[in-house]
Amino acid sequence: MNGKRYELSILPLFEDDLNEIVDYITYRLKNPAAAERLVDDVEAAIIERLTCAESFEPYHSARERQYPYYRIQVRNFTVFYVVIGNTMEVRRILYSRRNWKDHI
């Protein structure tokens, strides 16, 4: 590692995505403990990535992007983020088997 630690920015769209996932697991699947564990795992994965946000292969989006997307796999979900200067901006969390082309 290079010792650099990025600032963290979380977009409201990511929060909306995560809230939908948590609601689905909690109310539809009736498993609030699993929803809580997922949130803990997502948070831990994001914090861990703050020290090496650009050390992974960028995700090649079908759209032209000013900043390349990077991914973090957390269970059956993928967290998408970009790096802008010294900031890791977390933008989306999507179900890994979902067609991302319409969303990323």
Language-model features: locations:
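Enriched for short, Lys/Arg-rich terminal
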Residues: 29, 74-78, 82-104
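Basic/aromatic recognition patch in beta-strand/loop cores that engages polyanionic ligands
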Residues: 52-85
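Basic, Lys/Arg-enriched alpha-helical interface segments
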Residues: 1-65
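General helical secondary-structure elements
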Residues: 24, 45, 67, 87-88, ...
